[in-house]
């Protein structure tokens, strides 16, 4: 009775499992939305039931629901309450469930260390599993637990798995070094360094990729570790992971600066014995018009190894290669490579806006140092209306650095389109206006052309205050360079002060300041400008009011100097003492007093303090000091500082640090302590020889010539004659040698079945059954049938005899 009940219960459980599996399959066929709806309807009580289920699919559904709650920061269910139910499933054979439990432990392992220790035993057992993926998962799970008590266990595990036959596991060992170093670098510094040295001597490029990450993160200052691996890393850099390539290039740049001699620049233009000098510390400072660079062979090896990375899809790799050429090569060498083209191509092809802005900043940085690098790609930096604002601003700044006599017409036309078009944001228009000043600085003719276009466009269009401010600032800067040749422009600026009432405070203050600067050249128009400004003094902005005060003081100072000069000349002719300046009778002095009176009661404390300072100077009669302060010539604003916006006037700190020029080491030793070359190849460690089996992937990798293509097509695909012979059957392509030296041969089906021994057939015994009948009629009918049977039996007997004779033979 008990057995029957047990059989019925097991049958019901089996039916339940089959039903749930069928439901899960049906749900998966309905699509992701159906599964999401099912997952969201799992309540807390069902989570406990699913986690305690013996069905791995139900446990997986529960873990997926828990991870989704953790990712969405859903506060409706406290997933930490299921810690014990989750941890006990660590012994499952389902790899996906183990990965989900690993993610759960990352979040909550520190909150309950006692329960976390329950999973340690299972993870340690997985470290000895035959599946390399499970070993890798176990090591990753152990090293990710942020518990100080586990550090010795992890260190012991890392030391054990550093010689694992699987490259994936050894790569995970390198990542575990990073986690241990962050947890307690002072406690395990030497042990981790020894393990890293073993990983750096590995023969597998995948392990080297992970080891480079650990080296860059933990021991980047120990450049001496690269001595025995420098040349090998240069040769295998194309086989590494893209991010590891970037880190390795940065490390090798520092190594070259520290342990390789500085390149020598040889002058080819001089006659007789050629002159030479070390490569300058700053970029593009070589004085020779024609030169060649002599590099150390190891430096040439590193620079040539970068050529295989030109077509890398990772923008960071391209930037790192450009930085290597910027740090270690001459401008001519950098120009002759294809990395400038690759950098421009990466900018145009990438869709990630963060990467594009970073690349544009790098191009702008390099174009400031040497504009000839990017002159062939000027049109690649034209702005499109759909470009983001920051990327558009960087493109315009790059265009401004590329302006010269040969392309100024095209760039000026393009900048005018950005300014006049309504498709571009205001920030882009302002930057385009500021970049026009670079066109005006090429020559006097372009200076007049730019200012004329700006004034005409300003008078014919209704511009916003910020754009109008940019117009005025550009015109003011260009006029200040040569005011005598632009008097007509100056008169128009004077009219703008009264006509354009919407001018921003900064723009109006700039125009007023400009009249104070040209007072020594064209003094006659300045008093009339001051007279107009006094009438609306109280309605002006604080910057404009301050500049009106300074303008009135400057005009009074110039008027006093002109009066003294005229009186000194007249008194010398008449031999009389020069009279004093009449402040009460001078119209300029009266305007100065009016402005001074208004400024003393201004709301801005800066204007009040400045008014008291200026009045004290004039009241003391120290006019020479006043002239020295107010009439001193001001330096012309530099365009490099002017065209950049307030937000992007400098590059980001990351770009500055990335392109920071490293100094060369002058004390270099090429010989080690034993007298050998310090870069002599170190002893490598090949752990693949410990493998006890081989896979189809390894066979195909070692027999790459095996193909279904004909020998006539082999040459078209780059296969040599020997490979084509092996394809056609002449070569020994069916042989394979394992890591431990044992040879195998791939057999065909006929060869495989030919090894099966032939089985001999046994003789069969034939039994004849004869039925008798009492009916005479039936006897007659059966006689004929008996005859037939007799003939058949005789044939069967003869055949059996034949077979028996065959067996006897």
Swiss-Prot record:
Protein name: AP-3 complex subunit beta
One Pfam family named in its UniProt record: Adaptin_N
SUPFAM superfamilies: ARM repeat
Sites of Phosphoserine modification: 693, 698, 724, 726
Post-translational modification, as annotated: Pyrophosphorylated by 5-diphosphoinositol pentakisphosphate (5-IP7). Serine pyrophosphorylation is achieved by Mg(2+)-dependent, but enzyme independent transfer of a beta-phosphate from a inositol pyrophosphate to a pre-phosphorylated serine residue.
UniProt entry keywords in alphabetical sequence: Cytoplasmic vesicle, Golgi apparatus, Membrane, Phosphoprotein, Protein transport, Repeat, Transport
Residues annotated as transmembrane: none
Superkingdom of origin organism: Eukaryota
Family note: Belongs to the adaptor complexes large subunit family.
Main location: Golgi
Additional remarks: Present with 3570 molecules/cell in log phase SD medium.
Role according to the record: Part of the AP-3 complex, an adaptor-related complex which is not clathrin-associated. The complex is associated with the Golgi region as well as more peripheral structures. It facilitates the budding of vesicles from the Golgi membrane and may be directly involved in trafficking to the vacuole. Required for the transport via the ALP pathway, which directs the transport of the cargo proteins PHO8 and VAM3 to the vacuole.
Its membrane topology: Peripheral membrane protein
GO cellular component, one term: Golgi apparatus
Compartments it resides in: Golgi apparatus; Cytoplasmic vesicle, Clathrin-coated vesicle membrane
Organism, scientific name: Saccharomyces cerevisiae (strain ATCC 204508 / S288c)
Assembly information from the UniProt record: Adaptor protein complex 3 (AP-3) is a heterotetramer composed of 2 large adaptins (APL5 and APL6), a medium adaptin (APM3) and a small adaptin (APS3).
UniProt record, GO biological process: Golgi to vacuole transport; intracellular protein transport; protein targeting to vacuole
InterPro entries: AP_beta, ARM-like, ARM-type_fold, Clathrin/coatomer_adapt-like_N
Protein transport among keywords: yes
Comp. bias intervals (Acidic residues): 772-791
Segments of skewed composition (Low complexity): 792-809
Coiled coil: none
Positions of disulphide bridges: none
HEAT repeats: 37-76, 112-151, 153-186, 187-224, 524-561
Residue stretches of biased makeup (Polar residues): 722-739
Region (Disordered): 708-739, 763-809
């Amino acid at each position: 009775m008990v057995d029957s009940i047990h059989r019925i219960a097991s049958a019901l459980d089996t039916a339940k499992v089959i039903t749930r599996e069928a439901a899960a399959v049906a749900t998966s066929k309905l699509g992701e939305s159906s599964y999401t709806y099912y997952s969201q309807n799992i309540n807390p009580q069902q989570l406990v039931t699913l986690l305690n289920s013996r069905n791995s699919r139900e446990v997986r559904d529960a873990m997926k629901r828990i991870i989704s709650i953790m990712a969405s920061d859903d506060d409706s269910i406290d997933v930490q309450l299921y810690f014990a139910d989750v941890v006990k499933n660590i012994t499952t054979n389902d790899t996906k469930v183990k990965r989900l439990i690993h993610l759960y432990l990352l979040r909550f392992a520190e909150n309950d260390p006692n329960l976390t220790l329950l999973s340690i035993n299972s993870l340690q057992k997985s470290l000895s599993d035959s599946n390399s993926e499970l070993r890798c998962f176990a090591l990753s799970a152990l090293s990710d637990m942020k518990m100080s008590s586990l550090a010795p266990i992890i260190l012991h595990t890392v030391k054990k798995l550093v010689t694992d036959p699987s490259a994936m596991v050894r790569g995970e060992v390198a990542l575990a070094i990073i986690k241990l170093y962050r947890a307690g670098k002072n406690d395990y510094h030497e042990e981790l360094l020894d393990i890293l040295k073993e990983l750096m001597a590995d023969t597998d490029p995948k392990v080297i990729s992970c080891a480079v990450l650990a080296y860059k993160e933990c021991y980047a200052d120990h450049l001496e570790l690269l001595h025995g691996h420098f040349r090998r890393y240069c040769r295998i850099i194309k086989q590494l992971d893209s991010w590891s390539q970037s880190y390795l290039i940065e490390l090798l740049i520092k190594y070259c600066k520290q342990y390789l001699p500085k390149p020598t620049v040889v002058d080819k233009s001089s006659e007789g014995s050629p002159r030479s000098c070390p490569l300058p510390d700053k970029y593009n400072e070589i004085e020779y018009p024609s030169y060649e660079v002599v590099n150390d062979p190891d430096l040439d090896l590193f620079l040539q190894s970068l050529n295989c990375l030109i077509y890398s899809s990772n923008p960071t790799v391209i930037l790192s290669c450009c930085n290597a050429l910027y740090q270690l090569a001459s401008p001519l060498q950098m120009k002759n490579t294809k990395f400038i083209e690759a950098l421009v191509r990466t900018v145009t092809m990438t869709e990630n806006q963060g990467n594009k802005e970073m690349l544009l900043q790098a191009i702008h940085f390099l174009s400031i140092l040497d504009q000839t690098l990017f002159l062939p790609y000027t049109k690649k930096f034209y702005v499109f209306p759909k470009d983001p604002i920051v990327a558009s601003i960087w493109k315009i700044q790059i265009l401004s650095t590329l302006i010269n006599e040969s392309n100024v017409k095209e760039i000026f036309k393009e900048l005018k389109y950005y300014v006049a078009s309504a498709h571009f944001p205001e920030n882009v228009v302002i930057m385009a206006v500021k970049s026009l000043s670079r066109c005006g600085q090429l020559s006097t003719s372009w200076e007049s052309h730019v200012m004329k276009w700006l004034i005409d466009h300003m008078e014919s269009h209704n511009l916003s205050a910020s754009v109008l401010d940019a117009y005025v600032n550009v015109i003011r800067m260009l006029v200040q360079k040569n005011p005598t040749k632009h008097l007509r422009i100056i008169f128009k600026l004077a009219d703008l002060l009264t006509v354009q009432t919407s001018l921003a405070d900064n723009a109006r203050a700039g125009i007023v300041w400009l009249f104070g600067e040209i007072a020594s050249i064209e003094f006659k128009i300045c008093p009339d400008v001051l007279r107009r400004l006094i009438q609306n003094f109280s309605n002006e902005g604080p910057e404009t009011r301050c500049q009106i005060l300074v303008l009135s003081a400057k005009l009074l100072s110039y008027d006093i100097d002109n009066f003294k000069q005229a009186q000194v000349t007249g008194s010398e002719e008449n031999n009389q003492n020069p009279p004093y300046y009449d402040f009460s009778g001078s119209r300029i002095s009266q305007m100065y007093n009016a402005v001074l009176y208004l400024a003393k009661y201004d709301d801005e404390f800066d204007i009040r303090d400045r008014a008291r300072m200026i009045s004290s100077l004039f009241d003391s009669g120290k006019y020479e000091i006043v002239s020295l302060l107010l009439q001193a010539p001001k330096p012309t604003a530099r365009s490099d500082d002017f065209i950049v916006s307030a937000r992007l006037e400098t590059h980001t700190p990351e770009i500055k640090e990335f392109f920071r020029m490293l100094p060369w080491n002058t004390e270099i030793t090429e010989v080690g302590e034993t007298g050998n070359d310090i870069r002599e190849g170190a002893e490598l460690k090949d752990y693949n020889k410990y493998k006890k089996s081989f896979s189809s992937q390894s066979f195909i990798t070692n027999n790459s010539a095996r193909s279904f293509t004909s020998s006539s097509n082999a040459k078209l695909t780059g296969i040599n004659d020997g490979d084509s012979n092996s394809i056609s059957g002449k070569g020994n392509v069916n042989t394979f040698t394992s890591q431990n030296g044992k040879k195998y041969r791939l057999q065909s089906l006929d060869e495989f079945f030919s090894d099966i021994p032939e089985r001999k057939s046994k003789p069969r015994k034939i039994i004849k059954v004869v039925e008798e009948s009492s009916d005479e009629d039936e006897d007659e009918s059966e006689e004929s049938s008996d005859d037939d049977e007799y003939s058949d039996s005789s044939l069967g007997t003869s055949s059996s005899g034949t077979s028996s004779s065959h067996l006897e033979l």
